[in-house]
Amino acid sequence: RMGYAPSKPCKPLFIDDSASAYLHLLYQNNERAPHIDGLALAYAHTKVLEVPDRPIRPEILRPLLAACRNGLRLEIEYVSLNTPNVEIRLIAPHTLVYSGMRWHVRAYCEKNRQYRDFVLSRLRGNPDLLDASENTRELDEDWNTEVPIIFTPDSRLNAAQQCIIETDFGMTGGKLVVSSRKALVKYVLARYQVDPRNQATNPEAQQIVVSNIKELRPWLMHD
């Protein structure tokens, strides 16, 4: 197979020359690689674990996007684990969010009179677009306010093990500080596989903990 080999002075123009940038590019283009000439070789020794898609109908997504873009209210049919029977909700959505495992929409809920997350795969029927809403993204305090999440190695690990964990997660001074919107704190913890309710009995399995968990508890309520 013909191709180009970079010389030592060669510098990439569209990404930086870090390993993380290249690996991120591999991840982003994994699904397209078999269909694009020239990418197949780069991906021949790469395997990305994909999360199965949750079924979301276009008839649900289209009005959601329109409501987000135009600041409109939306009438939806929704089910949840607490309310398994279909319930009519009036919401004012403003942002679609992918947590790494599922899609949800951040929206003002007129029933509960607060901003909440609605899982897209739990919407039923066809949403109806209504009039403009006064409850916009600008009024969603938990969305517009960021807090630091401080990860540290599990203190039950010995010094050598903690040093390995610090390197694994790119920690500085023994901690990794991740800034997050308040509304997304619980999803960030899930991405780092930290369950704030249950600590693993094996510190080698736990690996990292959140040192400022008390300050974050107001935003750890689960749906």
Question: Which role does the model predict for each range below?
Answer:
Residues P6-P9, P84-R89, S211-L220:
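Short, solvent-exposed polar/charged micro-motifs at secondary-structure junctions
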Residues H24-H45, V97-V105, L157-A159, M171-T172, ...:
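Short N-terminal signal/transit or membrane-insertion segments
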Residues N144-D223:
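Polybasic (Lys/Arg-rich)
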Residues R1:
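Basic, Lys/Arg-rich alpha-helical nucleic-acid-recognition elements, primarily the DNA-binding modules
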Residues P12-S20, R54-I56, P93-Y98, K214-D223:
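Short, charged low-complexity intrinsically disordered segments located at boundaries
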Residues P6-V79, R191, N198-N202, V209:
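Bulky hydrophobic/aromatic content
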